[in-house]
Every structure is written in structure tokens, then in C-alpha cells.
Design a protein with these regions (language model features):
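Catalytic-core regions of hydrolytic enzymes
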Residues: 13-145, 160-164, 168-172, 228, ...
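Conserved small/polar residues in nucleotide/adenosyl-binding loops
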Residues: 293-300
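Active-site-adjacent mobile loop/cap segments within catalytic or ligand-binding domains
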Residues: 32, 152-253
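Flexible hinge/switch segments at interdomain interfaces of large molecular machines
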Residues: 142-150, 206
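Cytosolic catalytic cores of cyclic-nucleotide second-messenger enzymes
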Residues: 304
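Bacterial N-terminal signal peptides
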Residues: 1-7
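Intrinsically disordered, low-complexity charged/polar segments
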Residues: 274-284, 288-292
């Protein structure tokens, strides 16, 4: 077992709560993208809960709010309303990507609100926004917005998002850790017209964890090691962002970054296979919360 590490964030009772809303995309009668062995809604929820637990365990000064913690349908505008009512400092929406049949791709991407500058980006926005079609009154709730019409997305061309720079910066941090910590294929930071981000009054990102339509990716997204690694990558990005914001606003921060901690000696037996490492992590996570030190051991082996 790895050594226990002190919380990364301030434990001061006087510290003002930093509020982060974690949104597991889709749910209930909306499965999201469907793969050969799984549904997007379940992958999203798995990673969202792991991310939230990491933050709650290591950051006593942070309040975590979920848009859902079980398999239920939440309208898009309600998700943003939850974040706005919580006066959130950050909104992180978690999704899983997909391509049409006979097309494959690998890797993770992070998105912010903006005008889609390519047909591919527009298609991602259309797919994520089409969830409103599950709502019987969507034409009224979304002022006639048609998620499948390119003309509807013109509204994003004239939007002024005052949180754009912060959102893009957080998205860049997430991609940095997906690439360097999780060893994922880095598909970059992109912009598109996502309704759930449009209605959120705080820095907001939408994360696409990988491609459920690619068999190898889908298998990875359904392993405990894979989802834990992805959640940890987002967690590291969150810590960095929070620390930077605290320094910018207060001149200092008590948030500790993982890379600032002393390196621990790797106790993983020589010749340990990825499967063996994954099994160990699964056993740990079923019995006790996975500590940061447990994560270090498998980050370099449980990846695509």
C-alpha cells in the first residue's frame, strides 16, 4: 500500500468554499453514445464520481456538487441551473465521444463554448445538444433551437463569453495531463456551441474522454484503471487551475500540486504487467478510496 499523503488543499475552516460542479453527461432514457459493450451515460457517471471523490478527499475547502449521482435524466438547462444556483467557480461536463460506423479514432479532447470552426466540431456539438430532443417541450425551453440545424448555431457567433480565457486555460490544463499523466492521445482543445456551456455563468469545459465507437477505446473506458486514470488527470488539472486562481486573487495559495510533493520510491515489482497492475488498482478501489499514491503506480501502464 502507498503512503498516505496530506490533503492538497487548505483544511482551514475559515477558507471560503471553492465550488465545482461536476456534470455526468446524459443519463436515464438518454444513453448518449452506445458502444458494443457499454453506454456513454455509465462511463460518464463513473468518471464523474471518481473525480468528485478525489476532490472531496484531498480538498477540504472545495465543495463538490453533482448534476446527477445515479442513472437519471437531467435536462440540459437544468444542469446549467444547478451550477448557477450553486454559484459555482467551475463547471466540468464529462462525456464520451463517438464516430459513425466504420470510423475509428483514439484520444481525449476538451471543449469550451464558442463557434464551431469546422464541420467536425459542429457535428460534436450537434450530437451533444441533440439530448434536448428527449424533452417534450424543448422548442419552448430552448427558444426554437434546433440541434440538428447549422443555422441554429449562428447565435454562438455573436456571443461574448467573459469566461472564455479561463475556460480555455482549464481545458489546456486538462489536455496537458491527459497527454503527460494519462498517456492519452491528445486531440486538443476545441470550441463549439454547446447549450449546457452557454447557460453556465462560470468558467466551463466539456471533456470527451475517448471514443466508445472504437473497440479498443471502449474496453479501456470500461476498466477501473482506465476511468481512475482519466479522473486523476482531470483532478490534477483542477488542482493547478485552483492554485493559479488563488495566487491571482490572493497573492498566495495553500493548494499543493502533486508534482511539488517528494517523489516516492516505486515499489512496483519488476516485470509487473499492465493487467496485474490494473487488478491491484481494482482491488484497492473496491475496498478503500484510491489514494494518490495508488494512482502513481498504474498511470504509466494503464493507457492507450
Amino acid at each position: 500500500m502507498g503512503l498516505l499523503i496530506s490533503p492538497f488543499c487548505s483544511s482551514s475552516a475559515e477558507a471560503k468554499d471553492f465550488v465545482v460542479v461536476i456534470d455526468a453527461g446524459h443519463g436515464g432514457h438518454d444513453p448518449g453514445a452506445v458502444g458494443k459493450i457499454s453506454k456513454e451515460k455509465n462511463i460518464n457517471l463513473n468518471v464523474a464520481l471518481k473525480l468528485g471523490k478525489q476532490i472531496q478527499k484531498n480538498c477540504p475547502d472545495v465543495k463538490v456538487v453533482y448534476t446527477r449521482t445515479r442513472d437519471v435524466f437531467i435536462p440540459l438547462d437544468r444542469r446549467a441551473e444547478i451550477a448557477n444556483n450553486a454559484k459555482a467557480d467551475l463547471f466540468i461536463s464529462i462525456h464520451t465521444n463517438a464516430l459513425a460506423k466504420n470510423r475509428t479514432a483514439k484520444g481525449a479532447s476538451t471543449w469550451t463554448l464558442g463557434l464551431a470552426k469546422s464541420d467536425a466540431n459542429l457535428e460534436v456539438a450537434k450530437r451533444e445538444n441533440s439530448v434536448i430532443l428527449y424533452e417534450s417541450d424543448y422548442k419552448t425551453r430552448y427558444a426554437g433551437f434546433n440541434p440538428n440545424s447549422a443555422e441554429s448555431y449562428i447565435i454562438f457567433e455573436f456571443m461574448q463569453d467573459k469566461y472564455m480565457s479561463q475556460s480555455v486555460h482549464l481545458a489546456s490544463l486538462v489536455q496537458k495531463h491527459f497527454r503527460n499523466t494519462c498517456r492519452r492521445v491528445d486531440r486538443g482543445v476545441h470550441q463549439a456551441g454547446f447549450l449546457v456551456l452557454k447557460a453556465s455563468a462560470m468558467p466551463s469545459i466539456l471533456v470527451e474522454l475517448g471514443f466508445i465507437s472504437t473497440p479498443e477505446e471502449e474496453r479501456y473506458l470500461n476498466t477501473d484503471a482506465g476511468t481512475t486514470t482519466l479522473a486523476n488527470g482531470i483532478f490534477r488539472a483542477f488542482l493547478t487551475y485552483k492554485r493559479e486562481q488563488e495566487i491571482r486573487l490572493n497573492g498566495s495559495s495553500q493548494t499543493i500540486l502533486p508534482e511539488d510533493l517528494p517523489e516516492e520510491k516505486d515499489t512496483t515489482p519488476a516485470g509487473t504487467t499492465p493487467n496485474a497492475t490494473e487488478k491491484t488498482v481494482r482491488q484497492d478501489s473496491n475496498s478503500t478510496p484510491v489514494s494518490y499514491t495508488h494512482l502513481r503506480a498504474h498511470e504509466t501502464s494503464a493507457h492507450l
